[in-house]
Amino acid sequence: MLQALLDSKDFLALTLANPQTLGDEFSFTLGEHTRVNVWDTGVIVFEPAQPQGKDVILSCGVHGNETAPIELCNTLIKQLLQQKIIAKQRTLFLIGNPLAINNGTRIIDENMNRLFSGEHSNPPGLVNPERLRAKKLETYVDRFFKAAAAGRQRIHYDLHTAMRASKHEKFAIYPYRPGRAYSAEQIMFLAASGVDTVLFHHEPTTTFSYFSSEQYGADAFTIELGKVYPMGQNDMTRFIAAQEMFTRLITDKPLQLESFSTDKVNLYQVCRVINKHFDDFEFTFATDVENFRAFPKGFVLAREGGQEIKVEQEVESIVFPNAKVPIGNRTVICLIPSVAPDVR
C-alpha cells in the first residue's frame, strides 16, 4: 500500500481500490517537513514538523455521488504528496463513503450524514456500511483533535454538492451552537472561497459538521459547492476560489479576508424543519424546484395524512426538498432572511 501511494501520489485511487480497508496503518515522511499518516482507507493526516496553530479537517464523499469535493480534496492531497505545496497546519483528509463512491450512488443503505453524534449505534445499530463508517469517522476526528495541544483552533469543512440547482450556487450550513458566537472570520473565509451564502441552523442535528462543532468546539460547516455531477464531469474551474483558500489555510499563507459585512454575504436563519409522518407525503411544487425558492405566507407547501402544511412566515425559502425520505426523516428545511445573529 505504501509503495503504491508513493508511486502514484493518488490517494483517491488507493482508497477506491480498497474501499473497506487498507489493512494496517502506515506512515512516511516528506522531506524533513511533514509526517504523513494513513489511518484507514480514505483517511490521511499531514503532520508538519513545526505546526502552526490550527487543526484542519477537510471531509468529502460522505455521499458517494457528490464528486466535485472528492476531486478537489484529491487534488490537494496530490499536491501535498508531490510537495508542490507544504502543509504548515495539521490537516486531516477524510473520504467519507468509498463504497458509495465506487457505486456511483449517494448512499449504499442509509444517509450517512444523519448518523453522527452516536446516531450510528442507536436502534437498529451497526447494521449497514454507512453506520459502521460513521462510527469510524467519529473516532478519527476524535483522535486527530485530541492528538494536539489544547487551545489550538479546530476547523472542519464537510464538503458536499447538492442534488438540485440553486439560486445561490454555493452555500454553507452553520451548525447550531448555543452560547457560542458565530465567527465573522469564518464567514468571510467562506465568502472568499466562493461560498457567499450561510444558513444558521436552529437546533441540534446528527450531521458530521454538527458533531465536530458540538463535541470539539470546532469551527465546522456543511458546505455545498454546487450541483452533483458524475466523477470526471465537473467543471473544476468553478472551484478555483475554494481550492485557493483551502491551500492558503493549510499552508499558512495570508488569508487576506475582507472585514465582515452583511452586504457581502447572504444570511438565512432556519425557521423550521418539516419531517415526514405519513407515506402519502407530497410537495405541491415541481420536483425540480431550485434551492432557495421563496414562497409567501399561506402557500401550501405539502400535504400528508389529510393535512396541509403551509408557509407560516411572511416569506419562507426552502432548501433540500425531498419527499422520498423514510418516515421520520427531514423532507425540507425552511428559511427566513437573517440579520446577522451574534457574529464576532
Curated annotation (Swiss-Prot):
Binds 1 zinc ion per subunit. The active site is at residue 224. Zn(2+) binds at residues 63, 66, 160. Its EC number is 3.5.1.96. The keyword Iron does not apply. Belongs to the AspA/AstE family. Succinylglutamate desuccinylase subfamily. Transforms N(2)-succinylglutamate into succinate and glutamate. One of its GO terms (molecular function) is zinc ion binding. The gene is astE. This is Succinylglutamate desuccinylase. Its cofactor is Zn(2+). The lineage of its organism: Bacteria, Pseudomonadati, Pseudomonadota, Gammaproteobacteria, Alteromonadales. CDD domains: M14_ASTE (cd03855). InterPro entries: AspA/AstE_fam (IPR050178), AstE_AspA_cat (IPR055438), Aste_AspA_hybrid_dom (IPR007036), SuccinylGlu_desuccinylase (IPR016681). Disulfide bonds: none annotated. SUPFAM superfamilies: Zn-dependent exopeptidases. It comes from Shewanella oneidensis (strain ATCC 700550 / JCM 31522 / CIP 106686 / LMG 19005 / NCIMB 14063 / MR-1). GO terms for biological process: arginine catabolic process to glutamate; arginine catabolic process to succinate. Pfam families: AstE_AspA_cat (PF24827), AstE_AspA_hybrid (PF04952).
